[in-house]
Regions:
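Conserved SAM-binding motif I beta-strand of class I
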Residues: 38-43
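A short beta-strand submotif of the Rossmann-like class I SAM-dependent methyltransferase core
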Residues: 94-97
């Protein structure tokens, strides 16, 4: 399940891509299948990186006769202090990460530092009003916002856009994603004490997995019409200015 749309990243063979906060590697796995792309997945959590590496091994095992021509690697590092030289990536993405960080402006500055002038940045965060609904349905103490490693803020995407412009980027476009996922999270939050056991939540989860694997026309249509209204995520794309 990809939140960043690769068609907006202007990918070209030989480019170097950074996925900051790659988690278990869903976007890295996508980049891995694009010929000629050299991608580095960075995350602070080593168990997530281990799963991301396993995913690459699985993909290569499924496609033994079509080895990607690019290079894929992973590295454990902090978003506040990336172990890379200035201007060394052509594309940087950071998907569903900033809402977890205490000092997200520092991470934005690091992304600007390592991204080449003219390079593309793709940022995704939870969409404001669906996220607020989650916070209200499972309020503190102990609710949705207070999950270990959970979301510590709700972004206004317009305000975030201007923060990135002030950090040295030119805004290009935005879109929303995962309209069918918001009801699932609302249901989990409404039944917070049973979020891992309730039959209805399990049923909806199975539906989302089925949709992800089968991609039927009906649910693709439903996602297309619901995402602009109640998409779980909003994606913003920028070009890095000259320094």
């Amino acid at each position: 399940m990809l939140t960043v749309k690769f068609k907006h990243l202007d990918l070209k063979p030989g480019q170097r891509v950074l996925d900051l906060g790659c988690g278990e590697g869903r976007h890295v796995h996508g980049f891995h299948m694009v010929d000629g792309i050299n991608v580095v997945g960075v995350d602070i959590d080593e168990p997530s990186l281990a799963k991301a590496r396993e995913g690459i091994e699985y993909l290569d095992g499924q496609n033994p006769d079509t080895s990607p021509t690019g290079d894929t690697s992973f590295m454990q590092a902090s978003a506040y202090e990336l172990p890379f030289e200035d201007d060394c990536f052509d594309v940087v993405i950071c998907s569903e990460v900033l809402e977890h960080l205490d000092n997200y402006p520092a991470a934005i500055l690091e992304m600007r530092r390592v991204l080449k002038p003219g390079g593309i940045l793709g940022i995704t965060v939870p969409h404001g009003w669906p996220e607020r609904m989650c916070w209200r349905l499972a309020p503190p103490p102990g609710g949705y916002p207070f999950e270990p490693g959970g979301h510590i803020r709700i972004f206004d995407d317009t305000a975030l856009k201007y923060e990135l412009v002030n950090a040295g980027f030119t805004f290009q476009r935005k879109h929303h994603a995962h309209g069918l996922h918001s009801p699932y999270w609302w249901l989990k939050c409404a039944l917070w004490d049973q979020r891992d056991t309730h039959w209805l939540i399990k049923l909806y989860h199975n539906f989302l997995v089925w949709d992800l694997m089968k991609k039927p026309i009906l649910t693709r249509f439903l996602d297309a019409i619901t995402s602009p209204i109640m998409g779980k995520s909003v994606a913003l794309y920028f070009e890095a200015n000259e320094k």
